[in-house]
Regions:
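Catalytic-site neighborhoods of secreted/periplasmic enzymes
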Residues: 89-205
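C-terminal, low-complexity/hydrophilic appendages and adjacent surface loops
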Residues: 173, 372-376, 444-495, 527
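Short, structured active-site-proximal loop/turn typified by the sulfatase FGly-forming signature C/S-X-P-X-R
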Residues: 51-84, 90-91, 95-96, 119-126, ...
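Histidine-centered active-site microenvironments of extracellular/periplasmic hydrolases
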Residues: 55, 247, 333-388, 399
Length: 529
């Protein structure tokens, strides 16, 4: 009996230890990794799954089938830095005082970045490729490698390409827009010919572009992290399809630009964008200026006399999107090979779009009017292994400022002390439980134009430019687009009587927005003037 009692207690102890071990394991279970795949200036419609007649993106198509896809995701401002900072800080440009690329305020200096939040929660943090961030938005990285040399970085593309013997080739590519080599290169002060519409075929061989470098560093990180007991947050940020438009030959050869055709997917030449011939007089002032050759970098007036230049640019843009897709595929394959794809949340998005020939325009027309869908509507897909409904599309209105609160709620992250509370909203219930967000509107704004976007309409409000009086376009008037009946945004219906009730409601929405987001950063910038 004594022996039996001892055995009984022995088994009780073993069972207790087993339970305790399981509890301990559950407490220390590693959180999911987070990988943001980011591109610069990616027009949302230029992907295969968007039924584009030309653009080839098999890897993004596959990712979309595994993700929740946001059809109505928008940039908070249609240029790089303000939009990227909204992603990284959860703040709107007016709060940061960051309406252009070069502004800095006490808000940007003290902002808490997404990387800092992850680091605070025990993540290893990485950034590869173009960051283009300010102040606190660029803090919190354990390892960071940019395109150009940056103080405090762990490496950069320029040093890498020089080490491989292709400095002159990269400088030639860079000069297509800037007329000289990149800062830090031997050709930084050289005079190298620019290219019409910033477009020419790269002299670099396949595998040596900025995109290749970003992918290579990301894949190396994945291999290093696969057995780590620490989760990772990685911001893999491709420079392209931003100008200069220099695809390598491998991808350019996929598009026939010799004439206008029915589309690459019909084994024809590229198809002319539907709004390509929109009359100049119907465009807002800054775009009229560009169209008439006001910016000699783009030579749009020359291009309309020789449409081959337009086809070269549009084909090059498509080729750059396909190149990004190729490297996205390599990164996703590396996750599979490391057997950690199902442990990794994957987000694909961009900071803003590119006209890509629509409205007869190139790039974002040098930070032109902050209103068109081509510039503001961005790709966004979120894949959470085992939780997201695969291939689901949602038409809910969202912005990049929503990403940081979404990840915090989804992963139950703790936040360090915040100087300013996040202004975006969490999409967790929408992504994980398919609960509607029921947002009536969102706002994207520059110094001279604020755009209110509802589910069916858009109002671009011209306003007093508080920092640059030469860019004050109130005389031109506001712009209204019926997104249901005019998806190409060709007809400005601001004076149409049938639109007045909708326009009035959009103005009410904007007044509501500026009360909720008063613009402490804007006030700081204006007071400095």
């Amino acid at each position: 009996m004594f022996i039996n009692n001892n055995l009984f207690y022995f088994f009780i102890i073993l069972t207790f230890l087993g339970i305790k071990s399981d509890i301990s394991k559950s407490k220390t279970k590693k959180k999911p990794n987070v990988l943001i795949l980011f591109s610069d200036q990616h027009n949302k419609k230029t992907m295969g799954f968007e039924n584009h007649p030309d653009v080839i993106t098999p890897n993004l198509d596959k990712l979309s089938n595994e993700s929740v896809v946001f059809d109505r995701a928008y940039a908070t401002r249609g240029i790089c830095v303000p939009s990227r900072m909204s992603l990284m800080t959860g703040l709107y440009p007016r709060t940061m005082g960051l309406m252009d690329n070069n502004e800095e305020t006490s808000v940007t200096d003290r902002a808490t970045s997404l990387a800092s939040v992850f680091k605070y929660n025990g993540y290893k943090t990485y950034a590869f490729g173009k960051r283009h961030l300010k102040g606190g938005g660029d803090k919190g990285w354990d390892i960071k490698k940019e395109v150009h040399p940056e103080e405090g970085d762990n490496g950069n593309y320029l040093s890498w390409i020089i080490a491989h013997g292709y400095e002159a080739e990269f400088s030639y590519d860079w000069a297509a827009e800037f007329g000289k080599g990149p800062k830090g290169s031997k050709e930084a002060n050289a005079k190298i010919p620019t290219a019409n519409l910033g477009t020419r075929i790269s002299k670099l061989p396949f595998g040596y572009s900025m995109e290749a470098y970003t992918a290579l560093e990301t894949i190396k990180m994945i291999d290093q992290q696969k057995n780590s007991d620490k989760p990772f947050f990685c911001f893999s940020s491709f420079y392209r399809p931003h100008q200069p438009y220099n695809p390598v030959k491998k991808f350019m050869d996929m598009y026939n630009v010799s004439e206008w055709g029915k589309g690459t997917k019909l084994n024809s030449a590229i198809k002319m964008p539907a709004s390509f011939y929109q009359p100049t007089k119907d465009l807002p002032p800054l775009l009229q200026f560009q169209r008439n050759g006001g910016n000699k970098v783009w030579n749009m007036d020359k291009a309309f006399k020789d449409e081959q230049l337009w086809r070269n640019f549009i084909g090059a843009y498509y080729a750059l999107v396909t190149e990004i897709d190729h490297y996205v595929g390599d990164i996703l394959q590396a996750l599979d090979k490391a057997n950690i794809k199902e442990e990794t949340i994957i987000i694909y998005t961009s900071d803003h779009g590119d006209f890509a020939g629509n409205h007869g325009m190139v790039e974002k027309a040098a930070a032109g009017h902050n209103v068109y869908e081509d510039i503001l509507n961005i790709p966004l897909m979120i894949r959470i292994p085992g939780k997201t409904v695969q291939g689901k599309h949602t038409a809910e209105l969202v912005t990049l400022a929503d990403i940081i609160p979404t990840l915090i709620e989804t992963l139950n992250l703790k936040t360090p002390k915040l100087e300013n509370n996040f202004e975006g909203v969490s999409l967790a219930n929408l992504v994980l439980k398919d609960k509607p967000l029921n947002r009536d509107y969102i706002v994207s704004e520059s110094w001279f134009q604020s755009t209110v976007i509802s589910k069916s309409a858009k109002l671009g409000i011209m306003k007093q430019n508080l920092v640059n009086s030469s860019q004050d376009y109130r005389e031109f008037g506001d712009m209204f687009f019926d997104r249901i009946n005019d998806p190409l945004e060709i007809n400005n219906g601001i004076n149409d009587q049938k639109n007045q009730q909708t326009i009035a409601q959009l103005r009410v929405f904007y007044e509501e927005f500026i009360k909720q987001v008063p613009g402490i950063g804007i006030t700081e910038i204006v007071n400095k003037k």
